[in-house]
């Protein structure tokens, strides 16, 4: 903005009034992350009021399903459903392994291994504080973690209230584990074939990977 001027209609944004994301977040999230800032937000506030912003909005966080296929990445902040998965692409079913599987396998939290949404809800809430657009968060439930394989309404209601308390702006999907593995179905559930497929993908030359060809 200092070089080329502010974006059109900048005067209609909250930024023009000197309002930053740290002024409008739900303060309950301070229970999770103390409001201690390393950046000089007050100097930034004055600079924005003086020069404007080149873009009217600065940050967003989407599930990034399509871009994750091309970039061979996981879906944004979402926990992967498995180390190996199949995704739809213009080429047809795409076999995809989580990035740096060999060195980071033990650092991944898989979606259906999670016993609840508490940690995920709090992480999204802490991020939302610094975002000027709504994060599309999801809730995921594995019935196997509950009595009679039924997710209690009280659990879902509790998650809903917790997301509101900590300042979520948008809730998107309610995912439920149905005990079906699309990848295993695709390869006829043959013993050891998942591990064989992982080995095959890991040995593939970078330029020859499925994502690179799309």
Explain the meaning of each model-derived region.
Residues 1-214:
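Long, C-terminal-biased catalytic regions of enzyme "large/alpha" subunits
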């Amino acid at each position: 903005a200092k070089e080329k001027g502010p974006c059109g209609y900048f005067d209609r944004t909250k930024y023009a009034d000197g309002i930053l994301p740290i002024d409008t977040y739900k303060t309950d999230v301070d229970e999770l992350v103390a409001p201690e800032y390393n950046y000089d937000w007050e100097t930034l506030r004055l600079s924005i009021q003086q020069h404007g912003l080149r873009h009217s909005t600065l940050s967003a966080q989407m599930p990034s399903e399509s871009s994750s296929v091309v970039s061979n990445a996981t879906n944004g902040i979402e926990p992967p459903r498995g180390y190996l998965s199949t995704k739809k692409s213009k080429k047809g079913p795409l076999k995809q392994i989580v990035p740096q599987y060999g060195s980071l396998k033990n650092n991944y939290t898989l979606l259906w291994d999670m016993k609840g949404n508490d940690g995920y809800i709090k992480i999204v809430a802490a991020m939302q504080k610094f975002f000027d657009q709504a994060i599309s968060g999801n809730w995921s439930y594995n019935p196997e973690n509950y009595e009679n394989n039924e997710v209690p309404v009280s659990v879902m209601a509790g998650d809903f209230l917790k997301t509101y308390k900590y300042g979520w702006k948008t809730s998107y999907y309610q995912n439920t584990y149905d005990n079906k593995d699309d990848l295993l179905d695709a390869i006829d559930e043959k013993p050891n074939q998942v591990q064989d497929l992982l080995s095959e993908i890991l040995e593939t030359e970078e330029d020859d990977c499925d994502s690179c060809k799309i």
